[in-house]
């Protein structure tokens, strides 16, 4: 039976981990699978999953699209804050143009195969201290963002500390 190594960066409660476990359950009759569900517990950064996959240390991984910006700059489209009106608009972009383009770029330039995109949910800005009503409400609030330089710049411009 062929070996298959899968790695991720989330714990048991994560929808990502649960999805990978669902996938493993569906293909476990065909592969001898090992799953390192959270490499960050071992001091590795989530972003290292890309190179681990490129180097065949693992064969399957998942990551937020922002991590791929240095490999496919066009993927920043998915990180444009406040750009898309709704999820259907994003899904249309992915299904009609972006997925095919990203697939080709990954395989031809990076020896990676895209299995698909999944919805990682909408991003909301909230705080347990105050109501955010306008950009002034954001001044000097700490915010955790994706690794996207675009997100960091936009939120800093709004007054957040990222």
Predicted feature locations:
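Short, well-ordered beta-strand elements
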Residues: 1-16, 20-24, 31-37, 140-145
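Generic non-transmembrane alpha-helix signal with a bias for helix starts/N-cap capping motifs
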Residues: 20-21, 46, 100, 148
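Hydrophobic alpha-helical packing residues
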Residues: 27-28, 155
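Acidic helix-start/capping segments at beta-turn-to-alpha-helix junctions
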Residues: 37-45, 49
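Contiguous mixed-secondary-structure segments that line small-molecule binding/active-site clefts
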Residues: 51, 56-60, 64-162
């Amino acid at each position: 039976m062929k070996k298959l190594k899968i790695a991720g960066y989330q714990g048991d409660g994560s929808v990502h981990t649960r999805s990978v476990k669902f996938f493993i359950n569906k293909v476990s009759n065909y592969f001898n699978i090992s799953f390192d569900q959270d490499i960050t517990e071992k001091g590795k950064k989530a972003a290292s999953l890309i190179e681990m996959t490129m180097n065949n240390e693992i064969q399957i991984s998942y990551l937020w699209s922002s991590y791929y910006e240095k490999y496919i700059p066009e993927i920043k489209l998915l990180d444009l804050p406040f750009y898309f009106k709704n999820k259907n608009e994003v899904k249309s972009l992915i299904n009609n143009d972006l997925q095919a383009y990203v697939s080709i770029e990954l395989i031809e330039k990076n020896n990676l195969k895209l299995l698909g995109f999944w919805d990682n949910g909408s991003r909301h800005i909230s705080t347990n201290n105050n109501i955010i009503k306008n950009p002034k409400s954001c001044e000097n609030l700490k915010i955790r963002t994706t690794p996207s330089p675009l997100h960091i710049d936009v939120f800093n411009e709004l007054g957040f500390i990222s």
